[in-house]
Amino acid sequence: MFFREVFWEVDLMKRFALEKLIEWKDKQNRKPLIIRGARQVGKTWLMKEFGRTCFEKVAYVNFDNNKRLEQVFEGDINIDRILLAISIETGVSIDAKNTLLIFDEVQEVPKALSSLKYFCENAPEYAIVAAGSLLGVALHKGTSFPVGKVDFMDLYPLTFLEFLYALGEERFANVLQSDDTDMITMFKTKYIERLREYYYVGGMPEVVKTYVNSKDFKQVREIQKNLLNYYRQDFSKHAEVSLVPRLNLVWDSIPMQLAKENKKYIYGQVSKGSRAKDFELALQWLLDCGLIHKVQRVGKVVLPLKAYLDLDAFKVYLLDIGLLIAMTDLDAQVIIDGNRIFTEFKGALTEQYVLQQLIASEGIEPYYYSTSNSSGEIDFMIQGKTSIIPLEVKAEENLRAKSLKAFCEKYHPKYAVRTSMSDYREQEWMTNIPLYNIYKIREYADK
C-alpha cells in the first residue's frame, strides 16, 4: 500500500483514504464523489487535506444551517448559477482544472445532493466531493438521490497501521507491511504493546490526536465519552421521536450482546419480551448512520456467500473498538496490562478489532458461519477471488482451533486462517497470522 503524508497540526499522520481520492481524481469518466461514514471519522478533514495537497484551490461549503446557499438550489438546477454563488460565498475563483469543490453536510440541502446528477451529466469536468454524516437517514426521508451519477468511498476510524503512523513510528509500521516475518517476530512484544494501546484508544481521529499529543488515557476517555454523547444527541435531533428510546436501548445493548458466548444478536435481550419488529427500525437507523456493523450468518459454504445469507441471524459490532471499551467503562490498565477477570470479554474486543481492520483497511465484507444449532461457529468467513477463507479469532497465544479444524475436515477449504497473538505459523491445514498484522489475510483473499 502507498501513502501520502498529511499533517495533523504538528503530528504526522497518514491515511489510506487519501490515495483512494487521488486515484479518483485521475480516473477517466470520473463522477462526483460521495464520502460516506459516521460522524467524527474525519470526512471533512480528509476532503480539505485532499484539496490542499492535490489542487491549487479549494471551494468549501457547509450546508448545515446555511440558508443563503439553500436558496441557490431552489427552483431549477442551473450549474453556472450554482458555481457563481459558491464562488461568491467562498471567495474562490472556480475553474474546472485547478479547483476542488467540497459539499459538506450535503444531506441538509436535498437539492444540493440532487444537483450532483446535473454536474455529472452537464459539467463532468468539475471535481466535486461531498459528504454527510447522516446521509443514509436523509435518504429514508425521501431525499432524491442521483442514482448512477456519483461515485462512492467509505471512510472509517483509523486502522492499527494508521495508528502507528500517527504515533510517528513510520519505520515500525513499514516493517509490518513487509514480508520479513523474522523481523516482525523480533519486535513482537512492541507490536503487542502498541496493539493494546490501540484497543483502548481506538481509531476515532480526535481521540487518536489527543493520545498522540498527551499520552494521557484519562483525556482519551473524556473525548470518547464526548463522542458517545454526541451520537446520543443525534438520536434525539434526527430520529423520529417514537424511535429515540429504542435507539438508546439497541445502542446500550451492544456490549452485552458481544459479551455472550454465542454472539448472535438476540432482540429479546434488548428489552425483556421484545421481538424483531420492535427494534428492526432502530437497528437499521444505526446502520444507516455508520455507527454499527452487521455481520450476517451464512448457512452454506459455497460461492457466492451473499446468496446464502440467513437474514434472521447476525452479529452486531460497534464502529470503533475504543468507543466500545468506553461504553463498558473498562480502565486502561485492564486493557494494557491484562487482568485475570478480563478473559471472557477479551474475546469480544478481539473480534471487534479484527472486524474493524478487515472492513476499514481492506474493504472486506465478512460473514460468519455456524450450524443450525450454533455449534462449531467460525468467527468470520471471507469470500476470496476463487475460494472461501474461514477465519478464527483468538485473543491471546492460544493455538487451539477446534472449530476451525472441524470445519476444515468437513469442507477442505483452500486456505484457513487463525489470528492470535502467536507468531506466524504455517501448518498443513492452516496459517496463523498475528493479530497486529491481520492485513496479510488480503494476500489469501486475492489468490
For every predicted segment, state its role.
Residues 2, 6, 139-260:
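Interdomain motor-coupling "hinge/lid" segment immediately C-terminal to the ATP-binding subdomain
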Residues 14-28:
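Pre-Walker A adenine-sensing motif
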Residues 43:
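Conserved lysine of the Walker
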Residues 46, 50:
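Hydrophobic positions on the alpha1 helix immediately C-terminal to the Walker A/P-loop
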Residues 65-97:
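Short glycine-rich substrate-engagement loop in P-loop NTPases that contacts/grips substrate
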Residues 102, 127-133, 154:
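Structural recognition of the conserved hydrophobic beta-strand(s) that form the central parallel beta-sheet
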Residues 209-377, 382-383:
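Accessory nucleic acid-recognition modules appended to NTPase machines
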Residues 358, 378-397, 416:
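Conserved catalytic cores of phosphodiester-cleaving nucleases, focusing on short active-site segments
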